[in-house]
A protein has these predicted regions:
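Short, small/polar-rich loop/turn modules that mediate ligand/substrate recognition or access, typified
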Residues: 172, 177, 247-249
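Conserved glycine-rich cofactor-binding loop
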Residues: 8, 15-16
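Residue(s) in the substrate-gating loop at a strand-loop-helix junction
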Residues: 140
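Active-site helix of classical SDR
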Residues: 120, 156, 164
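Substrate-binding pocket helix/loop in short-chain dehydrogenase/reductase
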Residues: 95-97, 101-109, 217
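Alpha-helical segment proximal to the catalytic Tyr-Lys
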Residues: 125, 169-170, 245
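C-terminal helical subdomain
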Residues: 180, 203-243, 247, 254-256, ...
Length: 287
């Protein structure tokens, strides 16, 4: 029996990148999936590619009525809701605090935090009646470690992680599990957009992001290869499945080790300099 046989999932931001790959994995494992995005042409084409197990609904997740309609669509089309994956995102350029644009901040929060709460709200109403369900929010290592990403994005992701824990404490008694995934540097169009590429070009050429990430992996990441969308999709599969039935309130970090510390290979030159400096400062040391 396939892992998600008979289950129904809604995945926001699923017309490209992590969301699209997760939809493919879920369908392959037996789920019915609602594809969610703003680009109708791309979404309809992707749903057709996945076949009868998929349906597309155009949604702006920053609009609460759209989020409700998205959940209603899943229930009307497939009869139930077993998993909501809050994955939609928007690019956010780095800005220094003194030049902060509060309108831009609000726009980022609307997608990365407010939409997460809206999704939880309407998914929980359905799942509570069923007595079971899994809500997954795609957060980021920027939500647990400062300095890697923009302030707006990082703050919203940090809040989404804590919202996940709060929701887990409330919804557990209703049989609903709530967890988050914090990806590291993953080769996606979203990453390429953050690096300044145009949206269409970025979505169609994730290999550009992979090349950029490859240039810093040796210094930043203990695992010496580039994270890919399938790494996150497989993590989502675990959290959506019954294999994670005893997991809730957890932020599952999938980042190649970036957030764990500083790679030994990267730190070695500084460590050697540190010891040479100590030796040179000792009394009687010969230059």
């Amino acid at each position: 029996m396939r892992t998600l046989e008979g289950k129904v999932a809604v995945i926001t931001g699923s017309t490209s990148g992590i969301g699209a790959r997760t939809a493919e994995v879920f369908v392959a494992e037996g789920a019915k999936v609602v594809i969610v995005g703003r680009r109708e042409d791309r979404g309809e084409a992707f749903a057709r590619k996945l076949g009868d197990a998929a349906s597309f609904v155009r949604t702006d997740v920053s609009v609460e009525a759209d989020v409700k309609a998205m959940i209603d669509h899943a229930v009307d089309r497939f009869g139930r809701l077993d998993c909501l994956m809050n994955n939609a995102g928007r690019s956010s350029q780095y800005a220094v605090i003194a030049d902060a644009d509060l309108e831009q901040f609000d726009a980022v929060v609307a997608v990365h935090l407010r939409a997460v709460l809206a999704g939880m709200k309407y998914a929980a109403r359905v799942m509570a009646v069923q007595g079971t369900g899994s809500i997954i929010t795609v957060a980021s290592i920027n939500g647990i470690r400062a300095g890697l990403g923009g302030h707006y994005y990082s703050a919203a992701k940090a809040a989404s992680i804590h919202l996940t824990r709060c929701a887990a404490m409330e919804l557990g008694e209703k049989g609903i599990r709530v967890n988050s995934i914090s990806p590291g540097m993953i080769a996606t169009g979203a990453f390429a957009k953050y690096m300044g590429m145009q949206p269409d070009e970025a979505d169609d050429h994730p290999e550009y992001a992979e090349a950029a990430i490859s240039s810093v992996v040796p210094r930043w990441q203990p695992l010496q290869y580039v994270g890919r969308v399938d790494d996150i999709a497989q993590t989502a599969l675990f959290l959506a499945s019954d294999a994670s039935r005893f997991v809730t309130g957890h932020n599952l970090v999938v980042d190649g080790g970036i957030s764990a510390g500083w790679p030994i290979a990267a730190a070695r030159p500084d460590r050697e300099l540190f010891f040479r400096t100590i030796q040179a400062s000792r009394p009687g040391h010969a230059a």
